[in-house]
């Protein structure tokens, strides 16, 4: 294991600081390191593996398509793209979908759509369009996505970033109201902040944002890359407040843990600003990606993983809330997306959990984030809870 870590560290760029663990196999909820030790994966590639690692249905779809046709580019039609587009548009109740690859790429596309809509439809002078984002957000690390962030450490050394972006506190509707100007074209938010620490907004906040957008002719963009597709116990986390955004951004679990697939969805009145040549993606919507994503969506539906997430997530949250320890500040979550916030450094607790076979990661130094595959069962949840009890007891 050490030789693998040394080799990787020697040749890899320095933008990651991985846990000193080498994983070589995954199946369902579990992963194994190179020494053969088994772990319950509570990271899931940050909600990529909602369907579990190497789900046989998705693997089968991948291998069958890979042996037939993998790439043709969007200059031609493929035989499976239209059916997938119909499926995902019906799921999101939107007219159109733009198929892409990574999550941050989809955010970039949504920014372009919002800017173009702002100038062409709302009538804002081109170059003066503004977008409001939330403090503590995470939309990605490419320049456009990064421009939405308020984290100076993420942005240091990468200026100049996009102009016309501002951030306000997540959950503060008064502050958001004050930030709106005639040039505001869009408000982008995560319905539940993931990287920020599983931050759930006050009840009614998402509805209030929707009302503001309707009042001021502003696009509401929901970044559901991490929290969508069953993670919080709903197909879309926006459903917790019965709100439909103007634009959905999806990714991560859309590729079933096997392939990078992302999407931007909107109705015709928004998506029509994209015309031939205004946007494109070499690999976006390729036949292999679409076969995998189709199977990934089918697995979520056929195995009722969204409902399972809500049911078992509630069970896990209730059990974790029984934990008593002076280090625990708050435990919060929706579905199988849970944050344990401590009033001290979380890293030592994470180390102890990993030693007990629970693979997890801290975020923002004091928060342990849990997002196991949605195929997890009650016995595995009992193991997670037992590990937490043991760690906090000792």
From Swiss-Prot:
Pfam families: Aminotran_3. InterPro entries: AcOrn/SuccOrn_fam (IPR004636), Aminotrans_3 (IPR005814), Aminotrans_3_PPA_site (IPR049704), Class-III_PLP-dep_AT (IPR050103), Orn_aminotrans (IPR010164), Ornith_aminotrans_bact (IPR034757), PyrdxlP-dep_Trfase (IPR015424), PyrdxlP-dep_Trfase_major (IPR015421). One of its GO terms (biological process) is arginine metabolic process. Keywords: Amino-acid biosynthesis, Aminotransferase, Cytoplasm, Proline biosynthesis, Pyridoxal phosphate, Transferase. Its main location: cytoplasm. It is an enzyme of class 2 (transferase). The modification N6-(pyridoxal phosphate)lysine is found at residue 252. GO terms for molecular function: identical protein binding; ornithine aminotransferase activity; pyridoxal phosphate binding. The keyword Ligase does not apply. The keyword Protein transport does not apply. SUPFAM superfamilies: PLP-dependent transferases. Its cofactor is pyridoxal 5'-phosphate. GO terms for cellular component: cytoplasm. Gene3D superfamilies: Aspartate Aminotransferase, domain 1, Type I PLP-dependent aspartate aminotransferase-like (Major domain). It catalyses: a 2-oxocarboxylate + L-ornithine = L-glutamate 5-semialdehyde + an L-alpha-amino acid. Its EC number is 2.6.1.13. Pathway: Amino-acid biosynthesis; L-proline biosynthesis; L-glutamate 5-semialdehyde from L-ornithine: step 1/1. It is found in: Cytoplasm. Belongs to the class-III pyridoxal-phosphate-dependent aminotransferase family. OAT subfamily. Catalyzes the interconversion of ornithine to glutamate semialdehyde. PANTHER family: AMINOTRANSFERASE CLASS III, ORNITHINE AMINOTRANSFERASE, MITOCHONDRIAL. This is Ornithine aminotransferase 1. It comes from Staphylococcus aureus (strain Mu50 / ATCC 700699).
């Amino acid at each position: 294991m050490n030789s693998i870590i040394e080799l990787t560290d020697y040749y890899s760029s320095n933008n990651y600081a991985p846990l000193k663990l080498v994983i070589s196999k995954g199946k369902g909820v579990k992963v194994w390191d190179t020494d053969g030790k088994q772990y319950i994966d509570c990271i899931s590639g940050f909600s990529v593996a909602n369907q579990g690692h190497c789900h046989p249905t998705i693997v089968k779809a991948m291998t069958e398509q890979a042996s037939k046709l993998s790439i043709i580019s969007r200059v031609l039609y493929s035989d499976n793209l239209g059916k997938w587009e119909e499926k995902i548009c019906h799921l999101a109740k939107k007219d159109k979908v733009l198929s892409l690859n990574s999550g941050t790429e989809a955010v970039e596309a949504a920014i372009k759509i919002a800017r173009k809509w702002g100038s062409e439809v709302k009538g804002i002078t081109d170059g003066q369009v503004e977008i409001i984002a939330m403090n503590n957000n995470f939309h990605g690390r490419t320049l456009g996505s990064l421009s939405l962030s308020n984290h100076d450490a993420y942005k240091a050394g990468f200026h100049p970033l996009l102009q016309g972006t501002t951030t306000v506190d997540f959950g503060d509707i008064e502050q958001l109201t004050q930030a709106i100007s005639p040039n505001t074209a869009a408000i982008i938010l995560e319905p539940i902040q993931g990287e920020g620490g599983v931050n759930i907004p006050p009840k009614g906040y998402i509805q209030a944002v929707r009302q503001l957008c309707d009042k001021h002719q502003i696009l509401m963009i929901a970044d559901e890359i991490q929290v969508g597709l069953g993670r919080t116990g709903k197909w879309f986390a926006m459903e917790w407040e019965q709100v439909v955004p103007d634009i959905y951004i999806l990714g991560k679990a859309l590729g079933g843990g096997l392939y990078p697939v992302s999407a931007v969805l909107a109705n015709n009145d928004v998506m029509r600003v994209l015309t031939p040549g205004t946007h494109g993606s070499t690999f976006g919507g390729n036949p292999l990606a679409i076969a995998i994503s189709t199977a990934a969506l089918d697995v979520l539906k056929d195995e009722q993983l969204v409902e399972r997430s809500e049911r078992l997530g509630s069970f896990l949250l209730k059990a974790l809330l029984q934990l008593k320890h002076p280090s625990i500040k708050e435990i919060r979550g929706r579905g199988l997306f849970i944050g344990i916030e401590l009033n001290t450094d979380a890293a030592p607790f994470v180390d102890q959990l990993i030693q007990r076979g629970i693979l997890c990661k801290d975020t923002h130094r004091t928060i342990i984030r849990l997002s196991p595959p949605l195929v997890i069962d009650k016995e595995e949840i009992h193991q997670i809870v037992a590990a937490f009890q043991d760690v906090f007891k000792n």
